[in-house]
Amino acid sequence: MKKCFTLLALVCATAAQAHVTLDTASATAGTYQKLAFRVGHGCDGKATTGLTVTLPEGASHAKPMPKAGWNIAITDSGALHEISWKGGALPDAYFDEFVMQVKLSGEPGKLYFRIVQECGKVSVAWDEIAGEKMKAPAPVLDVLPAPAGVPQHVH
């Protein structure tokens, strides 16, 4: 029985690493939040060479954390807000995090961050939203209402 639980835990841990995920499930509306996007593998055995995060409406003022060996590009053209890390190499056998800080709007709800993971000439879009059997789900952050009486301008 103990072996069964150990095996189940390993299978679940492997499944959890199969997508680009967020390090936190929820945050408070109206605050600044550090978000770490975890990349658990490359693309069919190839190293990850780029990651682009598209910010949803409700997340703004993004500031990426520098990452040694990677170039950062910020695109802010009206409705499109993206942060890209490119030029590095994250081998398929390893995981890493791509980190940014964002300002969350005062509105509670779910924010879906669309991701494009590049592995040389191959790319994977992690952009599926709300479904039971998604192959490439977008990371989601549940924005919770701010408690009454708590200032919302928190860094």
Positions of PLM-derived features:
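Low-complexity, serine/threonine/proline/glycine-rich extracellular segments that form mucin-like
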Residues: A25-P64
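Short, solvent-exposed loop/turn segments enriched in Ser/Thr/Gly
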Residues: G30-L35, D96-E97, K110-Y112
